[in-house]
From Swiss-Prot:
HAMAP family: PfdB (MF_00307). This is Prefoldin subunit beta. GO terms for biological process: chaperone-mediated protein complex assembly; protein folding. SUPFAM superfamilies: Prefoldin. It comes from the Archaea. Keywords: Chaperone, Cytoplasm. The gene is pfdB. Heterohexamer of two alpha and four beta subunits. NCBIfam families: gimC_beta (TIGR02338). It comes from Aeropyrum pernix (strain ATCC 700893 / DSM 11879 / JCM 9820 / NBRC 100138 / K1). One of its GO terms (cellular component) is prefoldin complex.
Length: 123
């Protein structure tokens, strides 16, 4: 006969699994933002070498729109700023989730090693 886990242990394990999935999503999103940031920085570096009156075009939907170098650089710097802010938030979320996962993992170990009897509550 298979013994069921105590409700407290089941609840903590369920929370642990949900947090792991959330962490996975945050890490994927962070990787996407980092790639976008690297691309923006690469384009900005390429634009540095162009003359101020260079003809540049920006894809808007399915249409190429002529823009000045200054407008493109301004747009890219704004995008870079937005991505850096988003990256900062994602790193903070990642750190928080990792700490929370470690805490719950430690509680689960303690509950399982102690037979889940008299375990502390407060997750």
């Amino acid at each position: 006969m298979v013994e069921r886990l105590p409700p407290e242990v089941e609840a903590k394990y369920t929370k642990y699994l949900k947090l792991r999935e959330t962490l996975s999503v945050v890490m994927r999103e962070k990787a996407t933002v980092e790639a976008g940031l690297a691309e923006v920085e690469s384009v900005l570096k390429e634009l540095e070498g162009l003359p101020e009156d260079a003809e540049l075009y920006r894809l808007t939907g399915f249409v190429l729109v002529k823009k000045s170098k200054n407008e493109v650089v301004e747009d890219l710097n704004k995008r870079k700023e937005d991505l850096e802010l988003k990256l900062k938030v994602l790193k903070s979320q990642e750190e928080h989730l990792k700490k929370e996962l470690e805490r719950i993992e430690s509680e689960l170990r303690r509950l399982l090693q102690g037979g889940a009897v008299g375990g502390a509550k407060g997750a």
